[in-house]
Curated annotation (Swiss-Prot):
Formation of pseudouridine at positions 38, 39 and 40 in the anticodon stem and loop of transfer RNAs. Homodimer. Substrate binds at Y111. It comes from the Bacteria. It is an enzyme of class 5 (isomerase). This is tRNA pseudouridine synthase A. It catalyses: uridine(38/39/40) in tRNA = pseudouridine(38/39/40) in tRNA.
Length: 241
């Protein structure tokens, strides 16, 4: 049977989503749980995408398919909940058609980036970016809107892929004591959101011009000197199917 499973996780102590030798990852933890509970050695779960070290998820999705998995959804749900650590929360388990693939069937994803320009909070260090000056929200939005549409994001990624064209469907910001940035796209490249956020902050703090950001979109080049916003403020917010 094939299952679609949604979860959230605190990425602070993980070396990202994807399994890595000798390192703790979300995929690695989950696959070991499946092996332990269901006694299946060759299990492999497929995430909607990868998150990097220190990046969190409000809602990640993965699919898992194996001939030995023949259980009702609630049995899988209860079994996983009983074994996951305190930094992983299983949200939902659904039986799906055998053709479902968590990565390839995703139509878009939304990422969220949390910035604190209000008051330093030691206990939020792993969950937000603190900046020690007030941000001009309007300038952040001006810069963000340059990225909407289909572009070659080679300048705004550290990906080794040759195909670096993606479509950003929408952006928005929300403001209370913190500034929260939302970006929805049909797909994301490695470090793409963090480099977009860093560029927007540089514009807000008068370190880069809108014209320069626009130039890097029109004339993309690998290795453009774009900063990388810290992983701590980044969340995979929602995956759409």
């Amino acid at each position: 049977m094939n299952y679609k499973i949604s979860l959230r996780y605190d990425g602070s102590l993980f070396y990202g989503w994807a399994r890595q030798p000798q390192k703790r990852t979300v995929q690695g933890d989950l696959e070991e749980i499946f092996k332990s509970i269901f006694k299946i050695n060759n299990i492999r779960i497929i995430g909607s995408g990868r998150t990097d070290k220190g990046v969190h998820a409000y809602e990640q999705t993965f699919s898992v398919k194996h001939s030995a998995l023949k259980y009702d959804s609630h049995i899988i749900y209860q079994a996983l909940c009983s074994r996951t650590s305190s930094d992983i929360q299983i949200l939902e388990v659904q039986k799906v058609d055998d053709s479902f693939h968590a990565q390839y069937n995703a139509t878009s994803k939304t990422y969220q980036y949390v910035i604190n320009d209000y008051e330093f909070d030691l206990f939020r260090n792993n969950y937000e970016l603190f900046v020690n000056q007030k941000i001009n929200d309007q300038k952040i939005l001006e810069a963000l809107e340059l990225f909407v549409g289909e572009h070659d994001f080679k300048s705004f990624s550290t990906s080794e892929l040759t195909m670096t064209i993606r479509r950003i469907n929408w952006v928005k910001i929300k403001r209370d004591t913190h500034l929260i940035i939302y970006i929805n796209a049909n797909g994301f490249l490695k470090n793409m959101v963090r480099m977009i956020v860093a560029s927007c902050l540089d514009y807000a703090f008068n370190k880069i011009s809108l014209a320069k950001i626009h130039e890097l979109l029109i004339y993309p080049k690998k290795g453009a000197s774009i900063k990388l916003a810290p992983a701590c403020g980044l969340y995979l917010y929602k995956v759409y199917y």
